[in-house]
Amino acid sequence: MRNILIILCLFLLNVSAQADRQERRFSNFNKWLVQNEFKDYYKLGFGEPIGKCKDLEKFSMHWYYNNCDKNKKIIGNYDVNTYNGNSEIPEKIQGKDVKANYETLLYYFWRYVHNDEGNWAGAPRYIDIKPSDNTYQFKFDLRNDKYIKKQMQKTALLSYLLYEDGKIVIDEMSPKDRFGKVYTNETQFHSQSVGKSLASYILGHAICKGYVGNIDSKINDWPIIKNSIYHDQKIIDIINMAAGDQAYFSKNNPSNRYKTGRSVSNTTPKKAMENEFKELKPSKKRYAYNNFLPHLILNYVIFKIGEEKYQELIDDIFRKKIGIEHGMFFVEPETSEPGDRSTRTTFLATRYDYLRMSKAMLDDWQNDTCEGKYLKSLFERRIKKNEQWENNKDSFGLTKSYAGFFHTGLKGMKKRPVFIMDGYGGQIFTIDFERARIVATIAI
């Protein structure tokens, strides 16, 4: 009985803390609405009277004399669904697609781009990348596309870019009366799983510089891997999500939760080896998507060269080669600490810088550079996905194969080299290497 009471008390305390946290979030969101003049979604009222104002009649001469009218309060005028405090808009609830209203989209946009607790913008930074001293300047030959314009006016799309034959030919952003007042060319937006593909691209550079062997090398020289499920595993199996680890992730949420229930994204590789994968053996190697393997491989690169040299590698890729215009950064997991510091593959960047990264991959492929040969080797070593991922709505389901943290094998063009970087919520960058075309979308 005593244990039940303790559990009940802890539950009630947690519920109370969550309610306080949500009230604080709404208060900050309301201030942001005022700052950005979203006038339809707030109104000004008066807060609870304090001091002398408690005993004075509202709007009386004495009430004004004592400045009681200065105690203003911003009151939200919106219908926001917080999905029980979820840090992201869920894609499905009980098997049905979620259709968030405008106010909810606006609220989550605010959460995504501002230093609010629980989101990437406010997460500890593992590495900062400064703007390039030699920014790549795009060429433009813009054309009007009525369909794309219409979608920008009624959907959660923030940005749409079409790059072909060396030029940007479609460049659309959310209009001012939707999200255009707050989403600009300077807004850093989260990558979500696009970071997986970028981790692969970084790995390719590390291989080309001789820091890492090749995609058939094993990662046995990393001490934390000893006696774990990933000992004796080839890099190609890890980056193809075919490490035989599917039995040790949650059946209900294999991307984000271990079988133990702990978070995948917020665990360092060392802690994962100690608590999730020690003394385990791999099962049959098949495609099994999760968020851990990209973190594992990116931190392996850091282990191989050290943090200082890793910063140099990142600067070479993003500042010297890609030529990013704005700064960007990668974040750390919550459990990262001195002595066990690690990076996530999640990063934040601006819309044109995302396109610059995609263009660099396209250039490497077409110029047959060492990194281009690496990308081609991924395509040659691609593996089939499983039927459980199939659907007709997104790149997960529309692609039949997986190539080193890239989706590929689109229906109707399975044998063509088209790579897709896909991030939760609508960060999708599709590179058609044969036709020199990139489609880049960013959404809430």
Predicted regions and their residues:
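Active-site Gly/Thr loop motif
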Residues: 324-326, 331, 381-438
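Classical Sec-dependent N-terminal signal peptides that target proteins to the secretory pathway
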Residues: 1-19
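Active-site-proximal loop and beta-strand segments within enzyme catalytic domains
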Residues: 149-150, 179-185, 190-191, 206-286
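Active-site-proximal alpha-helical segments within enzyme catalytic domains
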Residues: 293-300, 345-367, 427-443
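Active-site helix/loop module of the DD-peptidase/beta-lactamase fold
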Residues: 208-246, 305-344, 349, 366
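Active-site SXXK
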Residues: 166, 187-214, 238, 297-301, ...
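N-terminal leader/targeting segments and the immediately adjacent pre-domain N-terminus
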Residues: 17-181, 212, 240
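Catalytic-site signature segments of enzymes, centered on catalytic residues
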Residues: 173, 185-186, 250-335, 341-345
